[in-house]
């Protein structure tokens, strides 16, 4: 299940020096972001194992993007958690995921409108289809920039 998302983009012919990520503090090319992701993956490699589900508090920032891409590269399933959750909610999510293994690309949490929130496995194909459908509907080109307006803990924020 290991997925090197940036390498897949480059393999499709993207310019390594094209803008991949823009934050208030900096801009990242595909090549620069790939280096940062490889470094993060090397740091995490000894701490986690392929197939593991890894709960991760995510913010809408560069570090969270790098963390998610590094986990995917290692074949680890991130379970992004909203930093606005209470300590009790975060603890419950981490307890529920303890020891869980998955081949999913991510595990995102439902809102709990029909009961208690639960983790839902999301595939890479599903995330890709969502992103491609959004790009097609909005007529996006390689020159456009996408604003990360949804939390990375939300399925729409991952796509």
Which residues does each predicted region cover?
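AMP-binding/adenylate-forming domain of the ANL superfamily
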Residues: 1-20, 35-38, 53
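Conserved pre-ATP/AMP-binding loop-to-beta segment of ANL
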Residues: 3-5, 14-17, 97-109, 116, ...
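Conserved AMP-binding/adenylate-forming core of the ANL superfamily
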Residues: 17-47, 61, 86-90
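Conserved AMP-binding/adenylate-forming
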Residues: 26, 42-85, 151
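Conserved AMP-binding A3 loop
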Residues: 29-31, 105-132
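Conserved S/T- and glycine-rich ATP-binding loop of Class I adenylate-forming
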Residues: 54, 71, 110-113, 146
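Flexible, low-complexity linker/hinge segments
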Residues: 86-104, 131
């Amino acid at each position: 299940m290991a997925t090197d998302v940036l390498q897949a983009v480059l393999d499709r012919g993207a310019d390594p020096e094209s803008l991949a990520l823009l934050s208030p503090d900096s801009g990242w090319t595909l090549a620069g972001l790939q280096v940062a992701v490889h470094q993060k993956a090397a740091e995490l490699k000894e701490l986690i194992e392929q197939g593991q589900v890894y709960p991760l508090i995510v913010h809408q920032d560069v570090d969270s993007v790098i963390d998610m891409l590094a986990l995917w590269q290692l074949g680890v399933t991130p379970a992004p958690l909203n930093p606005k959750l209470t300590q009790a909610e975060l603890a419950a999510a981490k307890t529920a995921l303890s020891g869980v293994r998955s081949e999913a690309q991510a595990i995102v949490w439902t809102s709990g409108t029909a009961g208690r929130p639960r983790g839902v496995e999301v595939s890479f194909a599903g995330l890709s289809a969502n992103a491609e459908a959004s790009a097609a509907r909005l007529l996006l080109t390689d020159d456009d920039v996408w604003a990360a307006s949804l939390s990375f803990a939300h399925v729409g924020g991952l796509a």
